[in-house]
């Protein structure tokens, strides 16, 4: 008998609907014990005839209706877990859901562990390990790019690629074994050059997969964008404008921002940590100076530095360069306050700086919001300098480890072939590579590894 598990499958907190999921051998007895329709208990025959259909009925506790619900019954093996599975769709009041879940426990279910439903799906062959990890990534995705990459894996991109690698490895192994076993027979085998070329192509596929995954990783890692510059250039105003709330104090008094302030936001699906820093200036105030030093460290470690300058002040090229030359390199220059631009800030002066230092300059006004959409597009291109995610694939750390091992095995096998080693020697590397590719999709016997993977899930998944 398979023990029966139950858990809340929707998010914690109030909502229109809350779903309780139950899986295991006691699904039918539990359902019959807690469901009524027109004040009459449901029958097993009725539920079997209504499988995979929505049944409107009452959920009862101690013979009294607790809630009007929609019930779904999915008999094995045609369910998410591969076991008998049921879903109770109740109104999404947390107290109501807690009481209903307690009733299910009283009738023989036990609380599910994190990821246990998906683990059962894996153990029953409904999904492979790559698919399970993709579901976890899909649920936890924090950005548009991560969601797109997770969706590709849910629909089997990793499985397809690893299946190709496995198929090619089996083909190589079969050719090597045939040569070893039938070397005295009058048979024709592929040339060593052809075999080596196949290994090189397979190794290159693994290398590309790893590199593509590293590129994909850059899409989903949070980027740090630092607003940097002298006091009163509009850093705090731009910070508040970009995050849509008054997070930084705005004042005409220099030195108002004494320390850096960080906020998280999403720029068209790109996760960003936006940092407003203390204005850079010479000061005798020790506390302000400490804030300036911390701001410089933040700027040095940023993915993108937005160096703000105040165009309402007079511009003189030589003094400007003398003051800011070291800060310009590696920065995206944001020329703020163009709504009140000083006459000395004519177009040629900006172009001169742009050409001399090969800089990108964005002209904006935080006051009128002029140039803000263009700045955001420029920032997005700086952060991504990315292509579309269409040709990329995202490997989990565990998967990447095994693909790297395969790449290493193939490199070793190629080296052995070039040194005229017999097939009996380099076939061992192919055998190890085959073991590693099995680990990618789920030929994993280690319970500790499985536990680590599925513990990342929420309880109801």
Curated annotation (Swiss-Prot):
Subcellular locations according to the entry: Cytoplasm
One Gene Ontology molecular-function label: GTP binding
Positions bound to (6S)-5-formyl-5,6,7,8-tetrahydrofolate: 21, 87, 126, 461
GO CC annotation: cytosol
Protein residues bound to GTP: 232-237, 251-257, 276-279
Needed co-factor(s): K(+)
Keyword Nucleus assigned: no
Residues at which Mg(2+) binds: 236, 257
Cofactor binding mode and count: Binds 1 potassium ion per subunit.
Enzyme superclass (EC): hydrolase
Taxonomic superkingdom: Bacteria
Classification via CDD domains: trmE, TrmE_N
Main localization, broad class: cytoplasm
Positions of K(+) binding: 232, 251, 253, 256
Keyword Hydrolase in record: yes
Entry's EC annotation: 3.6.-.-
A Pfam cross-reference name: MMR_HSR1
Family: Belongs to the TRAFAC class TrmE-Era-EngA-EngB-Septin-like GTPase superfamily. TrmE GTPase family.
Subunit and interaction comment: Homodimer. Heterotetramer of two MnmE and two MnmG subunits.
Protein known as: tRNA modification GTPase MnmE
Gene: mnmE
């Amino acid at each position: 008998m398979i023990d029966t598990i139950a858990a809340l499958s929707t998010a914690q907190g109030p909502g229109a609907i809350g779903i309780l999921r139950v899986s295991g051998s006691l699904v039918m007895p539990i359902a019959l014990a807690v469901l009524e329709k027109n004040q009459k208990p449901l029958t097993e025959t009725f539920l079997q005839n209504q499988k995979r259909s929505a049944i409107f009925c009452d959920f009862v506790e101690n013979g009294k209706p607790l809630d009007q619900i929609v019930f779904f019954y999915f008999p094995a093996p045609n369910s998410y877990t591969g076991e008998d599975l049921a879903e109770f769709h109740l109104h999404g009041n947390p107290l109501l859901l807690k009481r209903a879940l307690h009733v299910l426990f009283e009738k023989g279910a036990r609380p599910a562990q994190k990821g246990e439903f998906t683990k059962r799906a894996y153990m029953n062959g409904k999904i492979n390990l790559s698919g399970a990890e993709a579901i976890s990534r899909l649920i936890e995705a924090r950005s548009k790019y991560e969601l797109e990459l997770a969706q590709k894996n849910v629909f089997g991109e990793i499985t397809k690629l690893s299946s190709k690698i496995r198929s090619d490895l089996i083909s190589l192994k079969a050719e090597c074994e045939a040569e070893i076993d039938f070397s005295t027979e009058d048979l024709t085998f592929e040339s060593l050059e052809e075999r080596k070329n196949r290994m090189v192509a397979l190794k290159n596929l693994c290398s590309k997969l790893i590199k593509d995954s590293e590129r994909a990783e850059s899409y989903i890692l949070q980027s740090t964008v630092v607003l940097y510059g002298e006091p009163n250039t509009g850093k705090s105003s731009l910070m508040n404008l970009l995050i849509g709330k008054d997070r930084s104090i705005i004042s005409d008094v220099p030195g108002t921002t004494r320390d850096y302030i960080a906020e998280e936001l999403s720029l068209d699906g790109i996760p960003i940590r936006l940092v407003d820093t203390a204005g850079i200036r010479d000061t005798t105030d020790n506390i302000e100076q400490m804030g300036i030093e911390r701001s410089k460290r933040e700027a040095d470690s940023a993915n993108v530095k937005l160096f703000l300058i105040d165009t309402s002040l007079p511009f003189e090229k030589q003094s400007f360069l003398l003051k800011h030359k070291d800060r310009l390199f590696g920065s995206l220059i944001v020329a703020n306050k163009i709504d009140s631009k000083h006459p000395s800030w004519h177009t040629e002066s900006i172009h001169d700086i742009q050409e001399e230092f090969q800089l990108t300059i964005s002209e904006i006004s935080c006051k009128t919001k002029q140039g803000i959409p263009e700045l955001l597009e420029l920032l997005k291109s700086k952060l991504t300098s990315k292509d579309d995610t269409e040709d990329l694939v995202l490997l989990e750390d565990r998967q990447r480890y095994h693909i790297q091992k395969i790449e290493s095995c193939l490199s070793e096998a190629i080296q052995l072939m070039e040194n005229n080693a017999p097939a009996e020697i380099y076939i061992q590397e192919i055998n190890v590579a085959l073991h590693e590719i099995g680990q990618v999709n789920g030929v994993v016997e280690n319970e500790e590894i499985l536990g680590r993977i599925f513990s990342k899930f929420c309880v109801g998944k």
